Amino acid sequence: MSAVNGNDGDSIIAEERLRPLSRDELERYHRNALVPQVGVVGQQRIRASRVLLVGAGGLGAPAALYLAAAGVGTIGLIDDDDVDVTNLQRQVIHITAAVGRPKVDSAAEAIRALNPDVEVVTHRTRLTADNALGLLRGWDVVIDGTDNFPTRYLVNDAAVLLGLPLVHGAVLGFNGQVGVFDARRGPCYRCLHPTPPPAGSVPSCAEAGVLGVLPGIIGTMQAAEALKLIIGGAEPLLGRLALLDVWGGRLREIPVAKHPACPVCGENPTITALVTEADSCTIPQTPGADAQPHARTAEDDSHRQSEGSRPDSSASPRIQGTGEAPTAESAADTVSAAELRQLLAGAEPPALLDVREEIEVTLEPMEGALHIPLREVVARMDELDVACTTVVVCAAGIRSARAIEALRAAGYTGRLVNLDGGVKAWAAG
């Protein structure tokens, strides 16, 4: 196959959009064009393409850099977050000096520095049911680098309604996954997971962590899948989900079939307009979070209502679900940070159990708390005093709720109360 003629396979880029490459472009992308499956025509397709990245974080960062380096003509970025110091461990498009800046601005600056010929379109906004169709319309392919389930489902549904291919990616710990969803010729994300998981049912990267190189691997794989769709003639991960265990050094794939009962792309779809899944999956963004595999994770429910916005807030704090001022004995299953402060100042303060990891406790200690990591809490439950109420805490109230469930299932008979919003809410006052 000629490196000049390129690949004659099915590309998502219409031939009428192609134009000759300049001498400077031929020199810059020479190594791409030397690959027979790419060729000059393939490079023309890359240069003519428009790729939208939803999320400029752990997955979007490497994807954006490699797409820019490859010569993608226009790259779009959607993200409403600012760069946080915790992002720098893996979000390689951002530098230390960018901390506090909008991610889309930091990423756009890095893209332009790498390849000034790339047009960058930025949207510093959160994707919603009201703006998603307008923001996704007109792009050739969408890369999902979202960090929460409501947005992930929204991106999928918008892509289906607009007839766009969607490149999915997710990471957590040592595990990642990548696949291509295109309802016109295969399944969509809802064919695999029809509805979001319950809020708090799975941990976030902020809670469970992620090995910094993993988003780089998965994000780069997403960029490769997008380029394959653009160039044509390749075998995209359509109807297949690649699963990577970087710790075990294993890469495998599972088939994903188009589901006839899929609510958005099935034979009788029930989703014909966009809705945000926030009611069934209240999972706002967490600084430093990344997209997570559905089966293992959910985004950290870390921005719950503050004490000042709670319907039952008053000068005399109440236990949630009661009309009484809090006491250790009357405490319900959940207690706010303000209520916990009142309990601790009382005559019979509750015990505190911190189920976070050691590094979290070191960075932000909870004074007076017994520290037992979540994974050890059942095995060490004899260290707890069943005679008194124990308030269980974690970063945001997710792991602590799971710790309470595990302890009760294991037969613990003492009273257990969850700190709503966790240490984040406690630190916020």
Give the role of each language-model region.
Residues 330-346:
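A short, well-structured juxtamembrane/interface segment
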Residues 352-354:
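Structural scaffold elements adjacent to functional motifs in cytosolic proteins
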Residues 421-425:
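Histidine-bearing beta->alpha loop at or near hydrolase active sites
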Residues 1-326, 330-331, 357-359, 371-374, ...:
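Adenine nucleotide-associated cytosolic modules
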Residues 401-420:
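C-terminal structural segments of small proteins and small subunits
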Residues 72, 366, 412-413:
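A structural motif
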Residues 341-348, 357-366, 372-374:
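C-terminal accessory/binding modules appended to enzymatic or scaffolding proteins
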